[in-house]
């Protein structure tokens, strides 16, 4: 997925 700062979004 992609990580930006404190937010992490898994690839779905």
From Swiss-Prot:
This is Periviscerokinin-2. One of its GO terms (biological process) is neuropeptide signaling pathway. Pfam families: Periviscerokin. Belongs to the periviscerokinin family. Keywords: Amidation, Neuropeptide, Secreted. It comes from Periplaneta americana. Myoactive peptide; has excitatory actions on the hyperneural muscle. The modification Valine amide is found at residue 12. It is found in: Secreted. It comes from the Eukaryota. GO terms for cellular component: extracellular region.
């Amino acid at each position: 997925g992609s990580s930006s700062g404190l937010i992490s979004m898994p690839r779905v």
